[in-house]
């Protein structure tokens, strides 16, 4: 009985410490100005990639290095990323090459996959993603809705919870979402530092979101 009570007390104490740590991480933190910011970009397939690359294309060279994360079977997004970065390098006369990297992770959920089984594939994707995010240690994560962004953002949040590094998470809801959030958006609403919507109807429903009009 004493052992059980001791274990229960230890578990309770650990839970309290984790909650306190999580609360501290989710609070606002001032960002120290720097010459460059390491950027991790999550690109989904199809329209998600087109939107996020339009946004990345408008960013200055100060966001460097740029690390792109895609699903392991997404060859189309890989080609679009390479094309964007090649065009950036050709248009930038101040540098001979552009500093970017492409990484692949397992999909969180395949098309038509059951919700129950997707829980396990998402956990596996998080297990795979955390070492990657820990190695990169980006200053900022930028994503816009694909399921692939969930394990990356959870991993980025864990870096802060563990006291390794505070990573700013910026989520941009897809332009296709006019009145309701995507599933990824509903999850990242609670985890992101900045949640950007592109329609006033969503801004009304989620007052703490940031509305800048159509940005992609």
Curated annotation (Swiss-Prot):
GO terms for cellular component: cytoplasmic side of endoplasmic reticulum membrane; UDP-N-acetylglucosamine transferase complex. One of its GO terms (molecular function) is protein-membrane adaptor activity. It is a single-pass membrane protein. InterPro entries: Oligosacch_biosynth_Alg14. The chain crosses the membrane at residues 4-24. It comes from the Eukaryota. It is found in: Endoplasmic reticulum membrane. GO terms for biological process: dolichol-linked oligosaccharide biosynthetic process; protein N-linked glycosylation. Residues 25-216 are cytoplasmic. Residues 1-3 are lumenal. SUPFAM superfamilies: UDP-Glycosyltransferase/glycogen phosphorylase. Pfam families: Alg14. Belongs to the ALG14 family. Part of the UDP-N-acetylglucosamine transferase complex that operates in the biosynthetic pathway of dolichol-linked oligosaccharides, the glycan precursors employed in protein asparagine (N)-glycosylation. The assembly of dolichol-linked oligosaccharides begins on the cytosolic side of the endoplasmic reticulum membrane and finishes in its lumen. The sequential addition of sugars to dolichol pyrophosphate produces dolichol-linked oligosaccharides containing fourteen sugars, including two GlcNAcs, nine mannoses and three glucoses. This is UDP-N-acetylglucosamine transferase subunit ALG14. It comes from Rattus norvegicus (Rat).
